[in-house]
């Protein structure tokens, strides 16, 4: 009996030491060691041409010194599958891996992470999927996971119960309660081809322009295909106001926004989750007013507007949802004629 226990303990210890030891060996090769497993060659090639090619694999994916038993157990199971020849058609990230990687993004992208973490796109599974007002009016369905929980491996019924208009609702996976339902990899593909990233300074700044116009990493993760689709390959919808075709900004970054902030099949402005601008803001990109990670808008009016409007009023104090969420004049769709009828007054003369 004691001998069996000792053999079992030795086997477990060997396995515990084998995986970190193997990880350390592969890490010493700067990524090339990973290609010893031939199924990793494609991913290595993608990384080697990406903006992150100057960053070692373990920096984002974890390595020998990662203090997460589940990480090493998962690697051990992958090793067993590899030895058995039980190889997946493609290698993807489990939801657990994605959540861990999101925290690692902060080590380099501090400003972006802070803005995302303080904004609505970091909303947790519990905040999104246990919302009483939403769930009472709209029955939860698998399609909810297209934007909220896109890396979750199963369906909505395995995540929330009950699936009905009457609660109380609870998460079947309580470990995901406080985890972000829209992590970094929802909108970014870390192996996307691009120029090598520049290391940030101690204050989080980088030399040169602070923001690329179209970062190569922008991509929407499609849970059906388990692929990240580049923003450059996503369509900008042809939006309508009644029968009229709405003028759209050509900013291709918006195509990513429209994957979730989308109209219904009629493509009418303000239908579904759409916020396409018409009226005084028609033709302006979402990103002209909303910051990419935090959706901060408080300073955005001053970017384009003089303080006073044609009416002689402070644009930030007008009766719109910019000033008050309860206003009947939504800032996305407000028109001069909403307040002035058919006669828009001429600009008031300034008083010296």
Where are these regions (language model features)?
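Short sequence/structural segments immediately N-terminal
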Residues: 1-352
């Amino acid at each position: 009996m004691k001998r069996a226990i000792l053999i079992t303990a030795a086997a477990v210890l060997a396995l515990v030491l084998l995986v970190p030891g193997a990880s350390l060996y592969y890490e010493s090769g700067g990524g090339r060691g990973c290609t010893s497993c031939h199924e990793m060659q494609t991913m290595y090639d993608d990384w080697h041409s990406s903006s992150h090619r100057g960053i070692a694999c373990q920096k984002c994916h974890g390595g020998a010194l990662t203090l997460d038993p589940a990480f090493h157990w998962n690697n051990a199971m992958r090793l067993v599958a590899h030895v058995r020849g039980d190889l997946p058609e493609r290698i993807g990230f489990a939801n657990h891996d994605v959540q861990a990687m999101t925290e690692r993004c902060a080590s380099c992208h501090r400003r972006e992470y802070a803005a995302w973490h303080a904004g609505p796109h970091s909303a947790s599974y519990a905040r999104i999927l246990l919302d009483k007002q939403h769930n009472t009016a709209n029955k939860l369905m698998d399609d909810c996971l297209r934007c909220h929980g896109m890396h979750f491996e199963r369906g909505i019924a395995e995540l929330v119960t009950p699936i009905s208009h009457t609660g109380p609702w609870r998460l079947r996976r309580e470990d995901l309660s406080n985890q972000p339902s829209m992590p970094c990899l929802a909108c970014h593909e870390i192996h996307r081809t691009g120029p090598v990233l520049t290391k940030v300074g101690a204050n989080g700044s980088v030399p040169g322009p602070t923001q690329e116009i179209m970062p190569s990493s922008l991509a929407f993760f499609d849970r059906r295909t388990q692929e990240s689709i580049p923003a450059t390959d996503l369509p900008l919808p042809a939006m309508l106001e009644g029968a009229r075709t709405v003028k759209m900004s050509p900013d291709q970054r918006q195509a990513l926004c429209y994957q979730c902030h989308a109209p219904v099949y009629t493509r009418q402005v303000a239908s579904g989750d759409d916020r396409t601008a018409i009226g005084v803001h028609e033709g302006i990109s979402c990103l002209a007013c909303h910051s990419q990670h935090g959706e901060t808008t408080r300073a955005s009016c001053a970017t384009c507007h003089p303080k006073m409007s044609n009416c002689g009023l402070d644009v930030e104090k007008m009766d719109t949802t910019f000033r008050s969420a309860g206003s009947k004049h939504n800032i996305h769709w407000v028109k001069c004629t909403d307040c002035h009828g058919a006669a828009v007054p001429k600009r008031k003369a300034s008083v010296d």
